[in-house]
Amino acid sequence: MATPSAAFEALMNGVTSWDVPEDAVPCELLLIGEASFPVMVNDMGQVLIAASSYGRGRLVVVSHEDYLVEAQLTPFLLNAVGWLCSSPGAPIGVHPSLAPLAKILEGSGVDAKVEPEVKDSLGVYCIDAYNETMTEKLVKFMKCGGGLLIGGQAWDWANQGEDERVLFTFPGNLVTSVAGIYFTDNKGDTSFFKVSKKMPKIPVLVSCEDDLSDDREELLHGISELDISNSDCFPSQLLVHGALAFPLGLDSYHGCVIAAARYGRGRVVVTGHKVLFTVGKLGPFLLNAVRWLDGGRRGKVVVQTELRTLSGLLAVGGIDTSIEPNLTSDASVYCFEPVSEVGVKELQEFVAEGGGLFVGAQAWWWAFKNPGVSPLARFPGNLLLNPFGISITSQSLNPGPFRTPKAGIRTYHFRSTLAEFQVIMGRKRGNVEKGWLAKLGPDGAAFLQIPAEEIPAYMSVHRLLRKLLSRYRLPVATRENPVINDCCRGAMLSLATGLAHSGSDLSLLVPEIEDMYSSPYLRPSESPITVEVNCTNPGTRYCWMSTGLYIPGRQIIEVSLPEAAASADLKIQIGCHTDDLTRASKLFRGPLVINRCCLDKPTKSITCLWGGLLYIIVPQNSKLGSVPVTVKGAVHAPYYKLGETTLEEWKRRIQENPGPWGELATDNIILTVPTANLRTLENPEPLLRLWDEVMQAVARLGAEPFPLRLPQRIVADVQISVGWMHAGYPIMCHLESVQELINEKLIRTKGLWGPVHELGRNQQRQEWEFPPHTTEATCNLWCVYVHETVLGIPRSRANIALWPPVREKRVRIYLSKGPNVKNWNAWTALETYLQLQEAFGWEPFIRLFTEYRNQTNLPTENVDKMNLWVKMFSHQVQKNLAPFFEAWAWPIQKEVATSLAYLPEWKENIMKLYLLTQMPH
């Protein structure tokens, strides 16, 4: 099938003017999906002629039937039937309602005849948009390779009828909508037409809210909220971007968990996780959804085999289902989870021709397993759903009640908010609902990840954003001059990042001021730089490999590597500041400042608006060894590796390497801090040897092999997403913590509580964690262990919270209220473990963590996990610890207590003393 660009050129070849009949008032056309494109657009941005494809056939739609019998438009009409006819020489059929068109075509040497019915032998069929008897025949004709030229307007038809839902009842729409083109009841302006040399843009917004309000009401009938609080799942956030798509459940940040859409003659409902098909509280909504998807046909409802629980929920509401592995030819509604690319086209045609699709899927796990690959572009569910105007993102939502849109109250939608943003940017005034611009930025950045090449519906948004952002200088967010997120400047930061990552010309994105990270201040080397990168990864997850290179902001770089490495699933990443700040109220930097992409070609170009250190992401179990990586457009950054970098090399790098961020590395820990801080470090070796001792202790307590298979990373940033520091890969901290990381004297005297707390968080395992009680507790075991065994700082001095009088008071307060595991959290929970450690030492913990690593099929519920811990620790120390844990109000099961009764009593149990001396409550 020809590309839309080539098709547009063919349709416009030789057309120099639009001499349309003055008395023919057209209607505006609405374009959705990935195949439709505009041909004629007036100066108001309204599409009046459009084209598309469906199946093996093609479609041209004009917004008034009189245009098809206007001799002045002969050049265009000839182009249209020529492009529509896939079989050269095949006759053109013209419906009697357009008889003058046959004469126009015949007068130009085209074999055209008046035909009351469409026939398979025809190459093209021309008809007005009011015929109600040939709908199925026309769709089949087009699907099988025929060309359809259709014209009409719906505003007058709407004025004469009782049904106001023109998009779904106008006869022409029952045909053209399968290819993504709708006649609307909006009158088209005819005061000025321009013959476009290149394909015009599709407008961001065509008003059709009235056509969708009944759908929303039917789906949410009797439902005030969508409560998934007890679903035990984190659904993906949905991006609702289609003109006929609408949200049904929103959180306080306008994050969408369930959405619906019209597409062609069919309907779609999407949930952000398949588990939502099993949530009992959603039962009324699930019933509403299936009935709406069925559209009153009372047809067959097919449920994918893996989702059989949904079948039971629907049966309670009186809906019979058929459990099948795949879609069946007689289905009216199909409920399933998309897990592969197989059958995408068939499913899209199923919907376009009237079917109902109920989809449940999340993309965050797929995104985790495929770093550097956008789920908007490659996740199987989105290959199916993107044309419907709903996409599943990698952002997760917290389970909880989601509000539903209320009639008469405006609800956030990407397209309507983008249209308002466009108005404000043009007029420099206007208001948008609270929180909408903060949501527009990340939504726009996500939308820009959808592959847009030769897809006019997406490219039009790209073009609009390029135009808007090129008019104004890009805000520069700093701590001294933060940018408010929920405003146009905040939205610009996210949208500009998305544009840059989509490959747009970065020269259009000029900052308000040049900062030290921008290319004018960091001149990249004119010659390519080649570095050897260790691409062996024995770990169980991907890892970042440092290159010692920095990419200036707004720089396009070219990365080259050997052919063999280009097929090894390597990725490239610019930047290490991975925190997503899209929900921050104020921004001290861009909300998303890294860029990742696959190194799937020997030579690859990549851009990053903000710049950053350059990394190669190596997949787990990679055995590539050393790989030469050549980069054009980079500068050197300070980098020190313990055992490899000499002191002379370090001093030279600090003086000569201009990168504003640098790294200190061992085989077990990598610290990323500003170069300005590194310049105060004359010799990193003593510091890093101390850090290696710390990491060895961390590994020893956690029963991990040392050296670590995957070095931990700590990255300093001007702003992070949560807390003073937070765990993860990498661990993130504020710039104020840099001295705590790189000042050896300070570490030895004051300690390392914050960083080791996060290293401890990374050591926690769900098998022996009891969230939320121990989330901020057990990680501090590593703090105590490191401070006492490596730094020689006793626990009472390492943290004021562990001063003995404070500890005793905490326990007594816990007991005085009546011991209850609901109140057993954080420091109180840590006390339980410290009492055990002070009695039995560290070795039982180390042996226990080793035992946990070697076991499989461990329980997942807190009560069962806590009882297993009691049993295993009791066996480690050969004491019956059930009474000790009962004193702490752990839910000890009777059979566990009985099974431990044979062990000796723990006579030194300190909780006995507390209980004996506790005042009655």
Swiss-Prot record:
Q: Which gene encodes it?
A: TCAF1
PROSITE patterns for this protein: PEPTIDASE_M60
Q: What does this protein do?
A: Positively regulates the plasma membrane cation channel TRPM8 activity. Involved in the recruitment of TRPM8 to the cell surface. Promotes prostate cancer cell migration inhibition in a TRPM8-dependent manner.
Written domain comment of the UniProt record = The C-terminal region is necessary for the channel activity stimulation.
Q: What is this protein called?
A: TRPM8 channel-associated factor 1
Q: Its GO biological process terms?
A: negative regulation of cell migration; positive regulation of anion channel activity; positive regulation of protein targeting to membrane
Q: Where is the Peptidase M60 domain?
A: 542-841
Q: Which GO terms describe its molecular function?
A: transmembrane transporter binding
